[in-house]
Amino acid sequence: MCIRDRYGRAQDAVSPNSVLHDHYAAQAVGRIDYDFSKTKIKGTQAIGVALRARQLDVWTSEFLAAHREATVLHLACGLDTRIFRINPPETVRWIDVDYPDIIALRRALLPERGGDYRMVGSSVTEEAWLDDIPADRPTLAVFEGLTMYLTQAEGQS
């Protein structure tokens, strides 16, 4: 997830009419030394970012309601806090995947999460990390901020 989206969610979180209520986003943005005005994200864009995230949260929650023992692969997770917003039961295996430096930043900025949760530091286009993912249950792949960064060849493989 790009810094622009994170800032949009933080703006939404402090709005009196918040759509997503992503308070972890606001906390994380407050801890990052960056001039967020460079993102040029405005109120309506922040709402759009939050609405997109909320819809993906709804779909993820519906999948987990139907599959109480599922695996969620959250690809290119960035600093997204979907696992905290959804708060899945401990029967759900949740795996956040992103580049190693992004995972390190996640660990520094976001709280620890219990249950069957782990973070994998890898490019999602590398297949080696998939070898460690058990294929023993229904699996949902969530990739909100990924496809626009893939080359055509990466997207097709």
Language model feature labels by segment:
Residues 128-129:
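Short acidic active-site motifs
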Residues 125:
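Adenine-nucleotide cofactor-binding loop residues
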Residues 149-157:
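A short, conserved alpha-helix within the catalytic core of class I
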Residues 1-73, 77-122, 132-136:
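Rossmann-like AdoMet
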Residues 141-142:
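A conserved beta-strand element that flanks and buttresses the S-adenosyl-L-methionine
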Residues 146:
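Hydrophobic adenine-recognition pocket in adenosine-nucleotide-binding enzymes
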